[in-house]
Amino acid sequence: MTSSLLRRVAAPLLSLLALALAGSLVAQTSSAPAAAPAPSGVARLDPTMGASQGAAAALTWHDVTTWGLEGREWTERPRLRWFDRFPAEAQKTVTDKVWNLSRDSTGMVVRFRTDASSIHVHYKLMKAQLGMPHMPATGVSGVDLYARNTKGEWRWVGVTRPDTQEVKVEIIKDLAPGLREYAAYLPLYNGVESMSIGVPAGAAFEGLAPRKRPIVFYGTSITHGACASRPGMVHPAILGRRFDLPVVNLGFSGNGRMDAAVGAFLVDIDAAVYVIDCLPNMGPGGVTERTAPLVRQIRKSRPNTPIVLVEDRRYTNDWITPGKAKFHDENHAALRAAYEGLLQEGVKGLYYIEGDRLYGDDTEGATDASHANDLGFMRQADVMEPVLRAALAASR
């Protein structure tokens, strides 16, 4: 083959190769966004069953740490992570399990006022596990948004549906015009590394500082939030909206045991009322041993703050499991005896909530017999509300 013929054959091939290389270079340097991954499972058939939609462009982002959260106490003390429930010093005094659980952001609420037509949130989660077998990602790792209506009542707006550890999504769009107050509840069983609220550029926005004198709940996995469908459906959150008061959630899954080390932090809070709801993690012996010392510990530092003692809920299948029914009977009797003993000592400002109907009496209030579903949380709030109302009235 002559050199002239070789040149004629090779020239088209070289041109094609150059075009391919140029196309590859353009693909690597293009600023066009990558296509979103195709939805899987049922979300292919019903988009409302998929993850939240991504955040829009042209937003102004507001870092929530610049004005603070409700449910985050001891703000003047150093923290290992800004969104931890306890300050760093607690790691040396509480149990390892309580410390690890305290890194979940349950009970924290960010409040703000805006006239935005849409609201977005960008947050990074501490843990990659977004949900649990008996609790959805919306509850474990979601951000749950409420707003005040024209009557000043809190009403639900929307919740994120996370499917990644970093969430940057639109919570709600097409909002009715007007300036209104919002409250966003942080995840129940995950921690938060950072969080910002996004609104369209030009929208009015004001971060609202945390309110004082919260209702303080100390309890177990149920107080922690298991198994609410979303963060605003836990009974401390429900009661906070009903009373329009801030709440501190010190629920520690499997580890709410009336620990004196936790009590040392409780007494540092200028609370409107303390709710002690630890029996689901305790037996009769522990209840007898620890109830009175914890109450005395609180009373020593907070002589006038009401204290509410709560019996544990009954397993919703204890009607057919005699051993569980007997355990609840004995646990309740132990708390009742401790309560009556404290009254005889002259301790004032004590209140008592019975546990038999915390979940109702139809067996439908729990996800797994032990942990509340949304119905169970609403029922707990209904039972607790009148007692808390009386306690709050007495403390004013």
Language model features with spans:
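N-terminal secretory targeting modules
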Residues: M1-L6, P12-L16, L21-P214, R389-R396
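Glycine- and acidic-residue-enriched helix-capping/strand-helix junction motifs
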Residues: G131-P136, G225-M233, K326-D329
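Active-site-proximal beta-strand/loop segments in catalytic clefts of secreted hydrolases
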Residues: Y218-T220, L250-S253, I276-N281, V310-R314, ...
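Oxyanion-hole/transition-state-stabilizing segment in secreted/luminal serine hydrolases
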Residues: L239, G256-S301, D312-W319
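Catalytic His-Asp segment of secreted/periplasmic serine-dependent ester chemistry enzymes
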Residues: D268, R313-R396
